[in-house]
Amino acid sequence: GALHLDRRTARLCRDIALCLRRIAHGSAVTLEHRLRWQRWMTRTRAVDEHLKDLFMNGIPTPDGGKFGGKGFRSTWQEAVACCATAMVRAVDLPERDRSLADVVAPMIRDVGLALAMGQTPLEIFAAQMGKSGSFMDGGHVGHGGRDLHVGNWDKRILPPSAPLPIASATTTGIALAANRLEIPRFHLAPVGEGCSSSGECWEAMNFAGARGLPISFMIQNNQIALDTFVTGQSGVETFGDKGHAMGMPAWTMDGSDPGLFYASTAVAREFATSGGGPTLIHVETMRGCGHAHHHDDLYLGAASG
């Protein structure tokens, strides 16, 4: 009984300390921070809308047809881009030091985060439209892109995988390598709440918790996975409870507040790089779109789908 109470007391003190650090980082946000975040989120929405336009209207192909690609939307989830402010970006370092840059694994709905970490709209559209110059060629030069499973390892942006939860496991492996090589690097692995139900995601979090790896998992609960609402996905009170089960600090934040994305990521990075281990950030948010471009009408209730 005394041992149990000691553990709970230690956890409470740790959680209070992390909460106070989040408040401190939030209080340090400047007007320049907010202007930069506004630019990032506006760019994300503009890219998102143009991708939708390309899907609906397409571009002419040599055989006389049209090609619009396949893609996923970020509507109402643009604020995740603000995590980049708290991270050491590869694009801000000399090329010789890029192995020290933080690693991020944006999900399909996190195009804004990929852009904020240094990817360009040109890279995004080249992948979406299957252009031969895309980085997303599967290792086969000139073979074209692959919708919005985009990334650029030179900028330490890991592309999403399908199934999506595998990216969490891959990022955990990269964090393990950094730990063993004593590279002072932070890793961020955002997923949706649907991903967090998968075995791969659970195994990744459990392994990170057991090894004390410098990684933060971010569960963005946008209230629906494909067509399954939250009540059909998990019985937990909040998705942050999953972190406590794995022995890592976890907290919940409002996904409509850019400052909280920054403050939470900054604290997770501090905790990880000081030897504290992994964290879980639970984001309560909502998506203003369907699962993908082809799914918007169905999501909004139209019989056509």
Q: Where would I find each of the regions flagged by the language model?
A:
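Glycine/aspartate-rich loop-and-adjacent alpha/beta segment that forms the canonical ThDP
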Residues: 1-13, 271-305
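Cofactor-/ligand-binding subdomain signature composed of acidic, glycine-rich
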Residues: 1-70, 100-101
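Cofactor-binding active-site loop characterized by glycine-rich and histidine/acidic residues
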Residues: 53, 62-211, 229-247
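Structural motif
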Residues: 105, 186-191, 216-218, 280-284
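Active-site cavity-forming subdomains of large catalytic enzyme subunits
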Residues: 207, 217-223, 267
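Short, proline-centered helix/strand-breaking motifs
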Residues: 214-215, 249
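Short beta-alpha connecting loops at secondary-structure transitions
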Residues: 223-228, 248-253, 299-305
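Conserved phosphate-handling catalytic cores of large alpha/beta enzymes
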Residues: 228-235, 245-280, 285-289
